[in-house]
Amino acid sequence: MLNRRETYLVVGLYVVLSAAFCWPFFAQPLASGSGDWDVHLFYYAAVLRNAAFGDLPFWNPWYCGGNVLWANPQASVVSPVYLLSLVMPIALAMKLNVLGHYVIGCLGMHLVVRRVIGVQSTAVAVYLASLFVFAGAITLHVRSGHTVFLPVFLLPWMVYCFWLATAGSTRALLCGSAILAVIVLNGGMHVLPFAVVLLGVLGLGALAAGRIKPLLLAVAMIVLGCAYAAPKIAPAVLFVRGGDINDTRPVKDPDYMSTEMLRISLFDGSQTTRVKVSPGVQLYGWHEYGNYLGWFGGVLALASAGWILAFGRDDWRAVAAAVGLVMVLAIAAGEFAAFAPASVMRQLPFFSSFRVPSRYMMLVPLVGAMTVAFAARALEAARGGSAWRRAIEVLCVVAVCEIGLVNRQHLREIFIVPADTQSRLFERTPPVIAPHPVVTPGPRVHRTFMLDSMLAGISPLNCYEPLQVKKVAVPGPVEIRGEGDVTLSASTFSPNRVAATAVVGRDPGRAVLNQNFAQGWSSSAGAVERDPSSGQPSVVLPAGYSGTIAFTFVPPGLWIGVAVSIAAIGLSIVVWRR
């Protein structure tokens, strides 16, 4: 157990290492990034813009002519970015958020290696934490702007709680479930399958060692965590599985990694400069496959797994980690055969929406580091003397520098787009729907211009979003129009609610909202239906109607999710106090 001074030193060390690794972000601290950075910053900006109107982040009228926000799996509803953006530009807030996630990942991995597994050497523990946190897979996704994968850094904390739960701590089970809920609420719906697979392979690995309790605890932690996060999960599932969605994600199969791709992924650090391997085999760019660990880390993980399975089966946790590493590698290898794990998982309802199996490579350094830690602990217990330990510690220090320097190069020259106008982030003006996004000056790099368009008050129909509702909105202001003998006046706007005063003549009329249609729209004047001519949200107004008509959006499944979450939290409080 570390004393307070040693704890401060360890935390300080990880802050320094994380800051050094993320330093390319801060070369231009206020600049935005290329690639998908713009659209993912836009998700956060849309939540803040809704808050400026006093609305919860239910609907995003600045996107594609109107799109779901709360039900969008990629949107975060809980994040430090929102508080930081109150005192600094959102681009800088996001960079500090990324840095914070790296530090949290290091500390979580350190706890697993030192307190759960029992590695004594600080140098070895720091290297194993670095092997996970500074690995190539998450770095390449951060480079691309895929902030939805940042919650991966919370997985070691969940695993830490899982190991404590297997030792008999009920409170650790509840804490692990709460961490899983935070992962989801923090925009980590894409990380939820990782969490399920991670706990699943550890549980199955324990089953291979003759213990069923860890598998049952893994299931309990997943179910309870999903119950906590049900207010986010239920609307997202209903949206993705519903009939309103226009899913533009390409389906490429079979998606698998050849032997050459696996070698390059784990042992070659030049992935961003490489062309695709074997045209027709590598279906995506290297950001979906790369995961540089270095020869030292990669070989050490595989050798440790082999040694544990052959000679170190006394500790069931070590066996679980070794079996888990083999299983994660098999899943990440993709659909290489009809019976491959990824091929089977694609047929399952939950996993079928997760279309790139190579992304499970992000779990390889986590499970691999645990496997090495179990082998290192056994080695520490088996041999005396200090000379060999000093040599290994020096090698670990060199390995930390090597993996950090090699993978940090992927983060260079990404944040080169001029800073946004922060003062416009909290403007309370209704958007105008336009055919195309606003193109702002800047470097000729891949950009989506979604954030720039929102700041300019534009909701572009030609938008960058794989999960969107079917487009029926038309260019023009976001407002209610009347069809038939209907007179409208005194229009008001907020993201979730558009209202106007309506007066209807002798014949029935119709009020139509210029937004895309989605389940969740309601009105104060009756049931909302698709307008027969435009497909937009509309309501039939009876003859002689006079009063305010308001279209309001609330994501379907929200209140069911809230009820499930309250019940789960209530049950957890009872269990916690026992």
Regions found by a protein language model. Name each.
Residues 14, 104-116, 121-207, 218-236, ...:
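Membrane-embedded helix bundles of polyisoprenyl
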Residues 6-15, 211-237, 249-252, 319-327, ...:
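Hydrophobic alpha-helical membrane-interfacial segments at the cytosolic entry of transmembrane helices
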Residues 227, 294-330, 570-577:
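Hydrophobic, aromatic-rich transmembrane alpha-helices
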Residues 17-109, 130-153, 253-287, 334-342:
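Membrane-interface coil-to-helix junctions
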Residues 41-51, 55-57, 225-307, 426-469, ...:
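Periplasmic/ER-lumenal interhelical loops and adjacent helix-loop junctions
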